[in-house]
Amino acid sequence: MSDSVLVYSTDVGRIKEEKASVVRPKGDGVVRIQKQTSGRKGAGVSVITGLDLSDEELKKLAAELKKRCGCGGAVKNGIIEIQGEKRDLLKQLLEQKGFKVKLSGG
């Protein structure tokens, strides 16, 4: 019954629900860059996983990478997606920031 919503309480004042914090699994310290085309009608996307950053830091990093690559992208569930096959450039940019990077997948 942990998913139940409070219906009645004798407490005085407004009762606020606690916000559930997003918990991501800890990685092994290696950032992986994959090429994905499945479900994208053949368009290639570079997917960056393994970054142990907060949501705001991920958004800032994604914005900088998109600007440096000159393309679009998105942040979804702790994963950065950059449009196009820019794996080599992304690897170079992330290594300059001090991340340990591996190219994985196709």
UniProtKB/Swiss-Prot annotation:
* Keyword Protein biosynthesis among record annotations: yes
Is this entry keyworded Metal-binding?
no
GO terms, molecular function: translation initiation factor activity
Question: Which Pfam families has this protein been placed in?
Answer: SUI1
Q: Which domain of life is it from?
A: Bacteria
SUPFAM superfamilies named among the record's database cross-references:
eIF1-like (SSF55159)
Q: What InterPro entries does the database record attribute to this sequence?
A: DENR/SUI1_TIF, SUI1, SUI1_arc_bac, SUI1_dom_sf
| Gene Ontology process terms (BP) | formation of translation preinitiation complex; regulation of translation; translation reinitiation
Q: Which UniProt keywords apply?
A: Protein biosynthesis, Translation regulation
In the record, the note on similarity to other proteins reads: Belongs to the SUI1 family.
Q: What's the name of the protein?
A: Uncharacterized protein HI_1225
Taxonomic lineage per UniProt? Bacteria, Pseudomonadati, Pseudomonadota, Gammaproteobacteria, Pasteurellales
